[in-house]
Amino acid sequence: MSYRELVAELPREHAEALSDALVELGALSVSVEDADADTPDEQPLFGEPGLVPERTAWQHSRVIALVDATQDPAVLLAAAANEAGLAQAPRFELREVEEQDWVRLTQSQFEPIHIGEKIWVVPSWHDAPQPDALVLELDPGLAFGTGSHPTTRLCMEWLEQTVQPGQTVLDYGCGSGILAILAKKCGAGRVTGIDIDPQAVEAARHNSERNRADVTYGLPDDCPDGEFDIVVANILSNPLKLMASMLASKVKPGGRIALSGVLARQADEVASVYARYIDIAVWREHEGWVCLAGTRRESH
């Protein structure tokens, strides 16, 4: 079966309605992009968690619908525009989509990732290249964290060097569960992963089962009382600052904490918030992102 992309540009107030109508009328997929991307008029859409976004749609949007090549694009777009309440259908262009083995193409884009000394993040269709590797089998999915992002990589390198056998570990903002799973494979004892997203929690549980890693996952209200030998939080700078007191309280006196999701220019500000609880500093920087790490003082 062959496909084409139907591409239309229109104001933000119509983009979502047209997208929904295209899906209802048989488009195989629909995406919305900033039509001004990579120009001086490009508009960042979302800010960090904890901040109210300035806008929820791009002023000038590009709607891209993947359609069966047998469909008449003009008829489809006219019907979608009518369904969406537009006065008339927007102008559009068609792009031919080359026939592909989509499964093979997707798999080829995700090769094993080597991190630290012995860590390999390996999709299920690959074998680990290193016989004595710490292997995490993880396929791309809904939850953040496959080892490709600099912040995930930094936290994994830190855990590989830090975790000692039997230590308790809290992964706050666990996403795919990759850090919690790694901690367990590094010999940790009780490991807990917490995330605000129920989908992430389910994905993390699935990934732990595949990796035969005994990790307990839950939402923030499920976070156990008590302290941990190690706390790792790969989130973003604003929520890290807002949760400083809580996260610091989860670290045992003398225990270790690592924070990432922090840009290099944000490091001093985040570190200053944690300084009242933790002796903390930049541990390592990679591609403009940093991992802050430190030890909780015996009393605070």
Swiss-Prot record:
Q: What are the BP-aspect GO terms?
A: methylation
Q: Which domain of life is it from?
A: Bacteria
What is an example of a GO molecular function annotated in this UniProt entry?
Answer: protein-lysine N-methyltransferase activity
Q: Kindly list the positions annotated as binding S-adenosyl-L-methionine.
A: T152, G173, D195, N234
Transferase as a keyword? yes
EC class of the enzyme, as a word: transferase
Gene3D superfamilies in UniProt: Vaccinia Virus protein VP39 (3.40.50.150)
User: Which InterPro entries would you find in this protein's record?
Assistant: Ribosomal_L11_MeTrfase_PrmA (IPR050078), Ribosomal_PrmA_MeTrfase (IPR004498), SAM-dependent_MTases_sf (IPR029063)
Q: Name one GO cellular component term.
A: cytosol
Q: Which UniProt keywords apply?
A: Cytoplasm, Methyltransferase, S-adenosyl-L-methionine, Transferase
Compartments where found: Cytoplasm
Q: What is this enzyme's EC?
A: 2.1.1.-
Keyword Nucleotide-binding among record annotations: no
The cross-references to Pfam families, in alphabetical order and at most eight, read: PrmA
Question: Entry's NCBIfam families?
Answer: prmA (TIGR00406)
Q: Which family does it belong to?
A: Belongs to the methyltransferase superfamily. PrmA family.
Query: This chain belongs to which protein, by name?
Result: Ribosomal protein L11 methyltransferase
Organism, scientific name: Burkholderia pseudomallei (strain 668)
